[in-house]
């Protein structure tokens, strides 16, 4: 036996057969395998052992001699004369530091792992780190026994959820319950992804409401009223931002609106009157300048809806202008010449380009941006109405159209509120996540998720 052990120590990587025939080969192989066995049990073995003795937690397990069990002197080590077993040097919270170092098997109703805290009430005795027997109450058993950090420090940071919007009156359509997108300065950080499905579900409800055959047309349109934005520009009230007011007694915004000289800080776009058999047209979007324009020599008429911008009474002949990276806005706007629109236009999402005369028309249809005379401004002119008569009529209250319009309006001003919404149904102070900005190479294959 001693010769076998000596030969094994000389060549530890080989299982040598004993040359002496007086010793059995089986004993020699057993000794050699014991020398190479693992000293500590694996987690699977510990779990199996915990399940086996779960019904009798006070059973005694005699470990073999080749497995080292940490002793009490190993738990209270000192470094430079200081005791490091106290809570001061422990990287774990206080309620778990008292039980570090020893494995405790607690009897419970369902016990799947020795390191997890049992779900049911338990009465057991285990040794603490100081080697003293401690009775555990059911309240103390719920604390994690294994020396792991608190679960709250392992997960992501919890964000407070914004307050829920009040429920609308039953008589109002579901399209008026969408939350507004207001990225205020200082609070413009994106919310956690747990709040993202809410705006998509609201957009989907908005889409379904506006695509209904019997949907009320005023549910998808709103009147825009300018007011100064002190949150963005401080005390300077000359930079207007747009608030979608929502009184129930507003005049019909589907008729052409005359803009006087005093109301030129923001352009209110309203749809023109449509024939009786025409399908419900789209949103009346809003485009506002970044600085107050000079008063025009004569009142302007803003057209949107089914009216072709090139056929408006104020439109005059002009040269064709190249499209400035595509505008998702679906309104033909009469703007003063001091405001240049092209540099703010963003690339359309899903490669869908919406124009005043289209209801989510085919992206292959050409869009011509004309630059009008010196007294007028650039307008977005789409294909004529007869060219779109053969296309399937869709409502512009579409998820992609709404998101593309919001994305383009984000380049104009920091305060964005979605159209198709009346502020009466919104309440005050509710904020949701803003539509993210896209780079130039990201506009081709992006689709917003729709929850059905």
From Swiss-Prot:
InterPro entries per record: FAM222
Organism field: Homo sapiens
Any Pfam family the entry gives: FAM222A
Name of this protein: Protein FAM222A
Alphabetized PANTHER family for the sequence: PROTEIN FAM222A (PTHR16070:SF2), PROTEIN FAM222A-RELATED (PTHR16070)
Lineage: Eukaryota, Metazoa, Chordata, Craniata, Vertebrata
Stated family: Belongs to the FAM222 family.
């Amino acid at each position: 036996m001693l010769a076998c052990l000596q030969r094994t120590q000389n060549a530890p990587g080989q299982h040598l057969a004993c040359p002496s025939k007086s010793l059995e080969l089986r004993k020699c192989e057993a000794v050699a395998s014991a020398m190479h066995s693992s000293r500590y049990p694996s987690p699977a073995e510990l779990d199996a052992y915990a399940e086996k003795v779960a019904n009798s937690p006070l059973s005694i397990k005699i470990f073999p001699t080749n497995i080292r069990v940490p002793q009490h002197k190993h738990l209270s080590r000192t470094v430079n004369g200081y005791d490091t077993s106290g809570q001061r040097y422990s990287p774990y919270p206080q309620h778990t530091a008292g039980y570090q170092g020893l494995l405790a098997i607690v009897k419970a109703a369902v016990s799947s792992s020795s390191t997890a805290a049992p779900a049911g009430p338990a009465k057991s005795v285990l040794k603490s780190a100081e080697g003293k027997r401690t009775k555990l109450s059911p309240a103390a058993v719920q604390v994690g026994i294994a020396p792991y950090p608190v679960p709250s420090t392992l997960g992501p940071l919890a964000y407070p959820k914004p307050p829920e919007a009040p429920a609308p009156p039953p008589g109002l359509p579901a399209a008026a319950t969408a939350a507004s997108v207001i990225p205020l300065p200082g609070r413009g950080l994106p919310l956690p992804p747990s709040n993202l499905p809410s705006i998509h579900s609201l957009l989907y409800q908005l889409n379904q409401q506006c695509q209904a055959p019997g949907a009320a047309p005023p549910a998808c349109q709103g009147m825009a009223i300018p007011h100064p934005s002190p949150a963005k520009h401080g005390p300077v009230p000359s930079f207007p931002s747009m608030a979608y007011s929502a009184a129930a007694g507003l005049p019909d915004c589907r008729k052409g609106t005359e803009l006087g000289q005093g109301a030129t800080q923001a352009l209110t776009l309203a749809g023109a009157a449509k024939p009786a058999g025409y399908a419900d047209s789209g949103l009346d979007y809003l485009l506002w300048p970044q600085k107050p324009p000079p008063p025009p020599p004569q009142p302007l008429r803003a057209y949107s809806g089914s009216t072709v911008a090139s056929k408006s009474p104020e439109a005059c002949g002009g040269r064709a202008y190249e499209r400035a990276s595509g505008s998702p806005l679906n309104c033909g706007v009469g703007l003063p010449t001091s405001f240049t629109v092209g540099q703010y236009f963003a690339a359309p999402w899903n490669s869908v380009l919406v124009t005043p005369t289209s209801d989510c028309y085919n992206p292959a249809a050409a869009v011509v941006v004309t630059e009008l005379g010196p007294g007028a401004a650039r307008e977005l002119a789409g294909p004529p109405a007869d060219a779109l008569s053969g296309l399937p009529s869709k409502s512009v209250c579409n998820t992609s159209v709404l998101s593309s319009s919001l994305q383009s309006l984000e380049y104009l001003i920091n305060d964005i509120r979605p159209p198709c919404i009346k502020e009466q149904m919104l309440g005050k102070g509710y904020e949701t996540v803003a539509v993210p900005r896209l780079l130039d190479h990201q506009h081709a294959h992006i689709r917003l998720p729709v929850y059905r």
